[in-house]
Amino acid sequence: MYNFVMRLLELKLTNYRNCRDLSLNLNSGKILIIGKNAQGKTNILESIYFLSALKSPRTSNNIEIINFNAETAEIEAELVKANTSVTLDYSYSKEKNRILKVNGVKTTPKNFKQVLKTVLFSTNDLLLLRGNPSDRRDWLDRAISQVYPAYDERLSKYDKIRIQKNNFLKELIKGA
């Protein structure tokens, strides 16, 4: 059985985009993020999603999360899940070295992504209502993968097989 109750208590960003050194205590319950444009509000939300998905919703190039004047970006979080304290630590360097730790112990991306569950809803997700069926499927696939990590693996295998099948059919048509 899955336990979905968790609370993010602390978030620390070091050289994450424009957040050079930011520590947030999120233990007060209700959080309101207020600031002028380009002050890092979206970066805070993105970093939380990044910890759960190990990718940014805004870029496919992880080097872009590193502050221009730094060599490494780091995201640290403390959360409580099923009455157990858990720490997450993600660091990424311009040399593309990635370190993932859960409770101070290095771990795999698969195990890391199983700790924090988030579902991102952004203005781009308005495509759920007006966009293509493929946009709806992509959003739903991301949401299901958060709840059932094995789904992500199966989906990747399915996509590879589908691409192979399509390539095979194209070759078959060319040969006919």
Residue ranges and their predicted role:
Residues Y2-F50:
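Pre-Walker A-like glycine/lysine-rich segment at the N-terminus of P-loop NTPase domains
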Residues M1-Y2, T84, K174:
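N-terminal leader/targeting segments
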Residues A53-L129, P133-D135, W139, I144-V147, ...:
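Nucleotide-state sensing region of NTPase/ATPase domains
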Residues N15-Y16, K36-A38, K110-F112, R136, ...:
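Short, flexible segments with low predicted structural confidence
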Residues S28, Q39, N43, S60, ...:
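Generic alpha-helix structural propensity
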Residues L45, Y49, I66, L140-D141, ...:
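Conserved protein kinase catalytic domain
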Residues L169-A176:
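Secondary-structure edge/capping motif, primarily at the C-terminal ends of alpha-helices
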Residues V147-F168:
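Amphipathic alpha-helical coiled-coil segments
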